[in-house]
Amino acid sequence: MDIMNNLPIPMVVEQTGRGERAFDIYSRLLKERVVFLVGEVNDASANLVVAQLLFLEAENPDQDIHFYINSPGGSVTAGMSIYDTMQFIKPDVSTMVLGQAASMGAVLLAAGAAGKRYALPNSRVMIHQPLGGFRGQASDIDIHAREILFIRERLNQILAKHSGQDLETISRDTERDNFMSAERAQEYGLVDAILTHRESVSA
């Protein structure tokens, strides 16, 4: 998994009954039901996340999945494939932002299982309306403008559902880039708790 922008990925060597076995660090963490979204949300990264979620559901449908997010956002359609899968599978998906969860990343953060959405103390969350630009004939521009408005309304509905804010508040607060500290994100309902130590995570 080339998550780290072509940087070398650390390997973990484990002793087994048949000798040593090497895993890249992300594959090893996947064994612990940890999934990462690092960087832009696009079709490639979304397909990786969806595949891992489905695999972990098949492995154990009754055990939580831990989804770590450090993302500036990206493609709405790619992000919605992750969102729909999170809602579709049986295991609870616990979400945590480390670094940033912006745009589609913030939607995925908020979409975690109720009571299991976390932020690290210095992480940042940003919500806004979807961005779009299109050139072409007037009729095509109109079609794309209506699609952007539809997507905006759908994302606002999702944020309202998971945050507990009313739709009017969400619509107003996403009119421009809206950056939040971990504390503000908790107040707003995008996360349930701020973690400083692992021991503070309830079982």
Curated annotation (Swiss-Prot):
Family the UniProt entry places it in: Belongs to the peptidase S14 family.
Function: Cleaves peptides in various proteins in a process that requires ATP hydrolysis. Has a chymotrypsin-like activity. Plays a major role in the degradation of misfolded proteins.
A Gene Ontology cellular-component term: endopeptidase Clp complex
Active site: 103 (nucleophile), 128
HAMAP family per UniProt: ClpP
GO molecular function: ATP-dependent peptidase activity; ATPase binding; serine-type endopeptidase activity
Native organism: Dichelobacter nodosus (strain VCS1703A)
Alphabetized Pfam families for the sequence: CLP_protease
Domain of life: Bacteria
PANTHER family (UniProt xref): ATP-DEPENDENT CLP PROTEASE PROTEOLYTIC SUBUNIT
Subunit structure: Fourteen ClpP subunits assemble into 2 heptameric rings which stack back to back to give a disk-like structure with a central cavity, resembling the structure of eukaryotic proteasomes.
Protein name: ATP-dependent Clp protease proteolytic subunit
PROSITE patterns: CLP_PROTEASE_HIS (PS00382), CLP_PROTEASE_SER (PS00381)
Compartment(s): Cytoplasm
Assigned EC number: 3.4.21.92
